[in-house]
Amino acid sequence: MLRYIGRRLLQTIPVFFGATFLIFAMVYLMPGDPVAALGGDRGLTEAAAAKIRAEYHLDQPFWMQYLLYLKGVFTLDFGKSFNQQPVIDVMARAFPVTMALAIYALAIESIFGITLGTIAGVRRGGWFDSTILVFSLLLISVPTFVLGFVLQFLLGIKLGILPVTASVSVDFASLTMPAMVLGGVSLAYVIRLTRQSVSENVSADYVRTARAKGLPGGVVMTRHILRNSLIPVATFIGGDLGALMGGAIITEGIFNIHGVGGTLWSAIIKGEPQTVVSVTTVLVLVYIIANLIVDLLYAVLDPRIRYE
């Protein structure tokens, strides 16, 4: 098991360096001059522009800027934005909110998706299965902003059981509706993936053998069917954490949540490469850590993977 963990940890190293290099290169090659844009229509004097470029190392060659960027990543010194605000402070305000929202959405899609998908997979072809398929298709078809406005109207305005927008101090109630919207599409995919996987394993030879041995239905379901069916589902859910955090910009805008999506969009519009690169790098780290956890979960669900 330790060798398996060690291999997976070593595999994350080239992924990290490759991803950070691509991120930095794409931001470096973005059209326009962020320093010149600071002056607006009036522009900056050559001396002022040169001073800003020297302060942010923009006068250095590409490879030197990349090395300084890596040094900042490993020392947690992400520099300052053009308004002299430490980037790490900006991320410290944005990431906890979006992380809480993404984990909440992930919990919704995992609990309800696996439960509904399992029932539909066991009872494939019945009325419940057909209803769940239609429900998941609707979730996939409806745009995120439409689902957000519909839930705001029904749950927030008509029924009044949830806040329409998030408060300044984001709490559990304020995040419930945004989490439902953010995890809506992923919920549909988890339902369909679980249903397909369970329906295939229900008729597998090892399940028939377990039942022939007289094992109780609950034991067959938990130890045999679900344990093998959840491997592809765990792959999707693990990779979805980073996608939820990076793709929360629409949901955050609808519910007035000041998180990663809004921070990243604002940095792109304002032309602040330090903030864009730093936020994206942390998102990459979230992806890598989430996938590492999924790899370790594989070994728990299927011990054979440890020895491959």
Q: Residue ranges of each PLM-predicted region?
A:
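Alpha-helical transmembrane segments of integral membrane proteins
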Residues: L2-Y4, R93-F128, T144, V168-E308
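Residue-level recognition of pore/gate-forming positions within transmembrane alpha-helices
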Residues: T12, T20, R42-G43, L137, ...
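Small-residue-rich alpha-helical segments with characteristic i,i+4
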Residues: V15, R123-R124, F128-L138, V142-T144
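Hydrophobic alpha-helical transmembrane segments of membrane transport/permease proteins
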Residues: V15-L67, L159-M177
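Membrane-water interface segments at the C-terminal ends of transmembrane alpha-helices
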Residues: L22-L29, K71-G72, V134-P163, V181-V185
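Membrane-interfacial helix-loop-helix junctions in multi-pass membrane proteins
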Residues: R53-F62, D77-I88, V168-D171, L182, ...
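An internal, D/E-rich "acidic patch" concept
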Residues: D59-I114
